A protein has these predicted regions:
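Interfacial "coupling" helices/loops that link adjacent transmembrane helices in transporter permeases
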Residues: 20, 271-315, 668-710
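Short helix-loop junctions at transmembrane helix boundaries
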Residues: 48, 252, 323-360, 646-653, ...
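Hydrophobic, regular-secondary-structure patches
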Residues: 30-105, 443-511
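N-terminal membrane-entry
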Residues: 250-267, 356, 647-664
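Selective transmembrane-helix segments that form parts of the transport pathway or gating/packing helices
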Residues: 307-324, 397-403, 704-718
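A cross-kingdom feature of multi-pass membrane systems that activates on extracytoplasmic/periplasmic
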Residues: 201-202, 210-258, 620-650
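Short beta-strand boundary microenvironments
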Residues: 96-152, 166-175, 192, 199, ...
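Feature of multi-pass inner-membrane transport and sensor proteins
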Residues: 1-26, 285-302, 329-359, 367-452, ...
Length: 784
C-alpha cells in the first residue's frame, strides 16, 4: 500500500497483522481459548438444561405446583386463572402398593384425574382422555400380558371382586412401576370414584397446575397464596422443573444457583485475565513501534484508537474460531454421552446450537478485548518519539536492592525477579490469571465429591433387588437370607429390622427409628463414618448405636438416648445411609441389640446384590422364590435399571468435570507459556545487551527461569490461599450441610496443581531461551 493510499494510521492495522503474524499468534490463541472455554461451558450447560427439562417433563410431568386441601369452588377458580395453562384434579389409591389391588398378577396403583392430565404428563400416549371404564396403563404391562389399545384387562380388588377395564393408551414412563414390579392405572374421576365407593376406600384430592409460558412463576404462586389464603404448607412445587426455570425457592436449589453463578463468574474472569494479560504483553513488545508513529505525527488519541482497533481486528478470526471450537466440542461431548453412557442421556441434543453459549463466548471476546486494550492503549499513547530511537523501554530495569540482597552474587536471579515485579500491573494480571485457574480447579473438584454423596446407588450398600412384606412389619424370616445367599447368582443378601420407638434425648421427648445392621452392612458403614467408631459390645448397661447425619437430626457422638427400659449411647455418626430422612432420628444397632430391645428377630426388608445384573432368568427365579415363599404378600423392587442409569450419570458427571479440569490445566499451561514468551520478546534487546557484556547461556536460563518462577510462586500463593477458602465454603454449602461430611484439605488436588504449574514453568522457559540463544547477539540487539 503506497503512502497516497493510506487514508489514516488505522490502515496500518492489516499491514501490521500480516507482518507480525507469528508474534500475534499467541495473543490470538489466548482469545480463541477464552472464547472456547466460555462457549463450551455455557453451551454444555444449555444442552444439559434442555435434556433435564425433557427428562423431567416425561418423568415427573409438566406441572409447576400441586395444591391440596382446598374446596371444589376454589379449585374451579384456580382453573380459570388467566396464567394457568392446564389444571387437573388428582387422586390415588394404593400408591404405597401395600393393598391387594392386582392387574393380572401384578400389584396395581389406581389414579383418578381430569382430562388435562394428558397435557400435564406428556409421557401418556393417548389421543383422547380415557372415558368411563377405560384406563391408561404403564407400558410395562405388555411384558407379561398381550395388551393393546382396546384390550380388556382384569382389575382384582381387595375384597376379591374383579372388574374389567379397557386399555385406552399407555404411559411410556415405566421407571417407577418397573422398580416396584407393579402397574399404574390412570382413569377418569368418574370411574375412579365408582371403584373407591365399591371398596369403601377413602382418598384425598390434589390439584396439579401448569402455568403458561413466560409467566413469572414465583409471583403467580405468591398471588395464589394471597388471593385464596392458601398456606405454603398446602402448595408443593415440582422442584426439578422450577429449578430448571430458575424459579425454585428451595434452599438447596437456591444454594446451587449461587454455586453455579460463582463458577460461571470465575470461568468468565479466567478468560478476561488471560486476554488482558496477553494484550498487555503484546503492546509492551511494540513500544518503539508506537514511538515511531509519534515521530510521524500520530497523536495520542490516534495511537489509543489504533491499539484498540488492532485488538478488535484479532477478534475477526479469534472469536468465530473460539465459538466454532466450543460448539464442536459440545457436539462431541453430547454425542459421547448419548451414544456410550446410557439411556439417561437419550434426550441430550447431539447437534444442538446454543445461542446462550455463542452470545456469552462472543460477548466475552469482544467486550474483554475492547476493555483489555484500554490500559495498553494508554501506555502506547504515552510512548515518546524518542522511544523510536532507543527501542522498547524496559520498566524499572535497575535491579532492586532487596533482590540483590536476597540473591547475593546471583545477579541473574535478581534480574529475573526484577523483570517479573517491575510492572505491577503485569504481575497482577499474571498472578490473577494463574490464581483463577487454580480457583477453578479447586472449585470444580468439590463437585466430584458432591456427586458421590448425591447419587446413592453408586454406594457399596446399593441393592439390585429388594423385598418387603406389604404390611411393612418385621415378618421376613432370616432363613430367606440364607436361601438367597445359597443361590449362585447372588453376591450378597442381607436384611434389616425396623421399629419406631418413643425416646428421650437431649432433654426432650420424641421418637427414634431403630434399624438393625448385620456384619456386612457395618463393614460398608465404616467408610461413611464422620465421627466416632462402630458399635461394639454393650458396656455398663448401655447399648452402643450409630446415628445418621441429617439437618433435622442433632444427635452426635456421646449423646444418650433413653428408652422405656434401656439406654443407648451414640458412638458414631454416618454421613450416608440407604434410608430416607424422616422427622425422627435414625438409630442403627446390631441385630443382637435390636432383638434385646424389641424382642423381634425377623426382617422388615431384605436387599439382594447380584453377581450379574443382566441375568434376567436369575432375577425371575429370585422373584418366584420370594413370591411363592411369602404367598405373594410382598412388595418386590427391581432397582437394577435405576442403578444403572444413575451409575451412568455418575461417571458421565465425572467425565465432564475431569474434561473441564483438563481444559483448565491445558489453558493454564498455555497461558504461562504465552505470557513468559511475550515477556521475553518484550525484553529481547535487553537480553542481547546482557549477552554482549558477558552473560553466559546458563545465567540467561537462570534469569528467565527466575522470572517465570516468580509468576508461578505468586500465582500459587494467591490461588491456593483463595482457592482453599472457596473450596471449603463450597464443600460446606453442598456437602457438610446436607450430608454431614467434614471438610478436609484436598492435598491430592494441591499436589496436582503444583505439578501442573511447575511443568508449565519448565515448558515456558524452554522455547524463549532456545530462541534467544539461536540468534546472534547483534541481531538480538537490533531487533525492534
Amino acid at each position: 500500500m503506497s503512502s497516497t493510499e493510506m487514508k489514516s494510521y488505522l490502515s496500518l492495522i492489516p499491514i501490521s497483522a500480516k507482518v507480525r503474524r507469528r508474534q500475534n499468534r499467541m495473543t490470538i490463541l489466548c482469545i480463541v481459548l477464552a472464547v472456547f472455554l466460555v462457549t463450551a461451558v455455557f453451551s454444555m450447560a444449555d444442552m444439559a438444561i434442555r435434556m433435564e427439562t425433557s427428562n423431567q417433563l416425561n418423568k415427573n410431568g409438566n406441572w409447576h405446583i400441586m395444591v391440596k386441601d382446598i374446596s371444589p369452588e376454589t379449585a374451579a377458580e384456580l382453573a380459570a386463572q388467566e396464567d394457568v395453562a392446564a389444571f387437573s384434579a388428582y387422586s390415588d389409591i394404593n400408591a404405597s402398593l401395600t393393598e391387594n389391588y392386582f392387574a393380572g398378577d401384578k400389584r396395581a396403583a389406581l389414579v383418578g384425574a381430569d382430562d388435562a392430565i394428558l397435557q400435564i404428563f406428556p409421557g401418556m400416549q393417548c389421543s383422547t382422555a380415557p372415558a368411563d371404564g377405560e384406563v391408561l396403563v404403564t407400558a410395562n404391562i405388555r411384558d407379561w400380558l398381550d395388551v393393546t389399545v382396546g384390550t380388556a384387562i382384569p382389575l382384582t380388588l381387595p375384597d376379591g371382586q374383579t372388574i374389567s377395564l379397557t386399555v385406552a393408551g399407555f404411559n411410556e414412563d415405566t421407571s417407577d412401576a418397573n422398580q416396584y414390579d407393579a402397574v399404574v392405572l390412570v382413569m377418569n374421576r368418574s370411574t375412579f370414584s365408582q371403584i373407591a365407593a365399591q371398596v369403601e376406600e377413602s382418598f384425598e384430592t390434589q390439584y396439579f397446575i401448569q402455568f403458561k409460558p413466560r409467566t413469572n412463576l414465583r409471583q403467580s404462586i405468591v398471588n395464589i397464596e394471597n388471593k385464596y389464603g392458601i398456606s405454603e404448607e398446602k402448595i408443593s412445587e415440582n422442584t426439578y422443573l422450577m429449578a430448571l426455570n430458575a424459579s425454585s425457592n428451595n434452599d438447596y436449589i437456591v444454594g446451587l444457583y449461587a454455586v453455579a453463578a460463582v463458577l460461571a463468574g470465575m470461568v468468565v474472569l479466567a478468560g478476561i485475565f488471560m486476554i488482558t494479560g496477553s494484550i498487555n504483553s503484546n503492546v509492551a513488545q511494540r513500544t518503539s513501534y508506537y514511538g515511531m508513529l509519534r515521530c510521524l505525527g500520530a497523536g495520542k488519541n490516534q495511537v489509543r484508537m489504533l491499539v484498540r482497533l488492532e485488538a478488535l481486528f484479532w477478534c475477526k478470526t479469534a472469536v468465530p474460531a473460539g465459538c466454532v471450537l466450543g460448539i464442536v466440542s459440545t457436539w462431541g461431548l453430547c454425542s459421547f454421552l448419548r451414544g456410550f453412557i446410557g439411556e439417561e442421556f437419550s434426550s441430550l441434543p447431539v447437534l444442538g446450537i446454543s445461542p446462550v453459549g455463542i452470545i456469552c463466548g462472543s460477548a466475552l471476546g469482544l467486550i474483554t478485548v475492547w476493555f483489555a486494550a484500554s490500559s495498553p492503549a494508554r501506555r502506547a499513547a504515552k510512548a515518546s518519539p524518542i522511544t523510536a530511537a532507543t527501542g522498547n523501554a524496559v520498566e524499572n530495569a535497575a535491579d532492586s536492592p532487596c533482590h540483590a540482597r536476597l540473591f547475593g552474587s546471583r545477579a541473574e536471579l535478581s534480574l529475573g525477579v526484577s523483570h517479573a515485579t517491575s510492572s505491577k500491573k503485569n504481575l497482577l494480571l499474571m498472578t490473577g490469571s494463574f490464581a483463577l485457574s487454580i480457583l477453578l480447579f479447586l472449585s470444580f473438584s468439590v463437585l466430584l465429591r458432591w456427586v458421590g454423596f448425591a447419587l446413592n446407588p453408586v454406594q457399596s450398600y446399593a441393592p439390585d433387588l429388594s423385598v418387603a412384606e406389604t404390611s411393612g412389619q418385621n415378618v421376613l424370616d432370616p432363613v430367606l437370607v440364607e436361601q438367597l445367599e445359597a443361590l449362585p447368582e447372588v453376591k450378597h443378601a442381607f436384611g434389616r429390622m425396623y421399629c419406631p420407638l418413643p425416646a428421650e434425648y437431649q432433654g426432650k421427648q420424641g421418637s427414634i427409628d431403630l434399624i438393625s445392621y448385620d456384619t456386612i452392612q457395618f463393614g460398608w458403614a465404616k467408610k461413611d463414618l464422620i465421627g466416632g467408631t462402630l458399635p461394639q459390645e454393650p458396656e455398663d448397661g448401655t447399648y452402643p448405636v450409630l446415628t445418621v447425619f441429617d439437618k433435622s437430626n442433632s444427635l452426635t457422638v456421646g449423646d444418650t438416648i433413653q428408652l422405656e427400659d434401656a439406654k443407648l449411647t451414640v458412638v458414631g455418626v454416618l454421613n450416608d445411609s440407604p434410608f430416607s430422612s424422616t422427622d425422627s432420628p435414625i438409630v442403627i444397632c446390631t441385630e443382637e441389640t435390636f432383638h434385646q430391645l424389641t424382642g423381634q428377630n425377623r426382617y422388615a426388608v431384605i436387599d439382594i446384590q447380584l453377581k450379574d445384573t443382566t441375568a434376567d432368568a436369575a432375577i425371575a427365579q429370585i422373584h418366584t422364590l420370594l413370591s411363592d415363599t411369602l404367598n405373594k404378600q410382598v412388595v418386590f423392587s427391581n432397582r437394577i435399571e435405576g442403578n444403572r442409569m444413575i451409575q451412568s450419570t455418575y461417571w458421565a458427571f465425572h467425565l465432564v468435570v475431569y474434561a473441564f479440569l483438563i481444559v483448565i490445566a491445558g489453558i493454564t499451561i498455555l497461558n504461562i507459556v504465552n505470557s513468559i514468551s511475550m515477556s521475553v520478546s518484550a525484553r529481547m534487546k535487553q537480553y542481547g545487551i546482557l549477552r554482549a557484556i558477558g552473560m553466559d547461556d546458563a545465567q540467561l536460563k537462570r534469569m528467565i527461569s527466575a522470572e517465570a518462577g516468580t509468576y508461578a510462586v505468586s500465582g500459587l500463593v494467591v490461588g491456593i490461599a483463595l482457592g482453599l477458602v472457596l473450596n471449603r465454603r463450597l464443600y460446606i454449602l453442598l456437602i457438610t450441610h446436607y450430608f454431614g461430611a467434614a471438610w478436609q484439605v484436598p492435598w491430592g488436588c494441591l499436589a496436582v496443581i503444583v505439578v501442573v504449574v511447575l511443568a508449565a514453568v519448565v515448558l515456558a522457559v524452554y522455547n524463549p531461551v532456545r530462541r534467544i540463544l539461536m540468534q546472534p547477539i547483534t541481531a538480538t540487539i537490533s531487533e525492534l
